[in-house]
């Protein structure tokens, strides 16, 4: 008898524990359901990096003095500085400068310790390539200014998305009760359908008017 009661008690305790764990998991799930979406539809939508984002390194050839401080402070000795000594001026003459972004860890030490500020971090993060050798940027590629996400005409930046209120950039911590800045996808689809129907009606009127004009001219 006591063994049966013990089994019933153990079963009840396990059932209560399982229900408690299930409730805790569902509470987390329901809490996330009330939040605004964070995922963006890349590449048609892109996140706007922060002001201190450490993206692709920009290099100014004219400012570089070939001191190789960037090489010494780099954890992996990554930058390759090709220079020769000018015997007349007794100064270094820089020939080439390259950084392999397939190996770079984007720590920013080279930018921080550069004495002439010829290196800077940009907001460019799209460095994917089919060939790893193409990730080795020379001084010409490093000198190219990146296209800003906020001025890229081919994408819709996050601050203009339908998910966020006007003036908001970060999706975290935004109250779901605040009105959205843009339009919902179904609203945009309805507008496109309405514009298409209006265009079709205009084309039909033009075709009918042209047909009537042809009949009048023929008569």
From Swiss-Prot:
Catalytic activity: a plastoquinone + NADH + (n+1) H(+)(in) = a plastoquinol + NAD(+) + n H(+)(out); a plastoquinone + NADPH + (n+1) H(+)(in) = a plastoquinol + NADP(+) + n H(+)(out)
GO molecular function terms attached to this record: 4 iron, 4 sulfur cluster binding; iron ion binding; NADH dehydrogenase (ubiquinone) activity; quinone binding
Any one annotated GO CC term: plasma membrane-derived thylakoid membrane
Locations listed in the record: Cellular thylakoid membrane
Chain sites annotated for binding [4Fe-4S] cluster 1: 64, 67, 70, 114
Major localization class: membrane
Superkingdom of source: Bacteria
GO biological process, one term: photosynthesis, light reaction
Residue ranges of every copy of the 4Fe-4S ferredoxin-type domain listed in the record: 55-84, 95-124
Gene3D superfamilies: 3.30.70.3270
Annotated keywords: 4Fe-4S, Iron, Iron-sulfur, Membrane, Metal-binding, NAD, NADP, Plastoquinone, Quinone, Repeat, Thylakoid, Translocase
Membrane topology: Peripheral membrane protein
Needed cofactors: [4Fe-4S] cluster
Amino acids binding [4Fe-4S] cluster 2: 74, 104, 107, 110
Disordered, as annotated region: 192-219
Bound cofactor: record note: Binds 2 [4Fe-4S] clusters per subunit.
Name of one Pfam family that matches: Fer4_7
Listed Low complexity bias regions: 208-219
EC number: 7.1.1.-
Primary role: NDH-1 shuttles electrons from an unknown electron donor, via FMN and iron-sulfur (Fe-S) centers, to quinones in the respiratory and/or the photosynthetic chain. The immediate electron acceptor for the enzyme in this species is believed to be plastoquinone. Couples the redox reaction to proton translocation, and thus conserves the redox energy in a proton gradient.
NCBIfam families for this protein: ndhI, NuoI, PRK05888.1-3
Descriptive protein name: NAD(P)H-quinone oxidoreductase subunit I
């Amino acid at each position: 008898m006591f063994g049966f009661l013990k089994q019933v008690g153990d079963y009840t305790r396990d059932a209560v524990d399982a229900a408690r764990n299930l409730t805790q998991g569902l509470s987390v799930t329901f809490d996330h359901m009330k939040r605004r979406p964070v995922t963006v539809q890349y590449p048609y939508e892109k996140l706007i990096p922060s002001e201190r984002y450490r993206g692709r390194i920009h290099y100014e050839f004219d400012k570089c003095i070939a001191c190789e401080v960037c090489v010494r402070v780099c954890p992996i000795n990554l930058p390759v500085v090709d220079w020769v000594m000018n015997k007349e001026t007794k100064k270094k003459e820089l020939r080439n400068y390259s950084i392999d972004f397939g190996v770079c860890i984007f720590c920013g030490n080279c930018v921080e310790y550069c004495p002439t500020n010829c290196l800077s971090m940009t907001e460019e993060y799209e460095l994917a390539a089919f060939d790893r050798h193409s990730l080795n940027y020379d001084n010409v590629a490093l000198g190219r200014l990146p296209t800003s996400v906020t001025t890229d005409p081919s994408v819709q930046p996050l601050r203009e998305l339908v998910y966020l209120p006007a003036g908001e950039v970060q999706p975290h911590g935004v109250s779901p009760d605040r009105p959205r800045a843009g339009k919902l996808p179904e609203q945009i689809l309805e507008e496109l359908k309405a514009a298409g129907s209006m265009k079709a009606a205009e084309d039909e009127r033009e075709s009918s008017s042209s047909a009537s004009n042809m009949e009048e001219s023929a008569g």
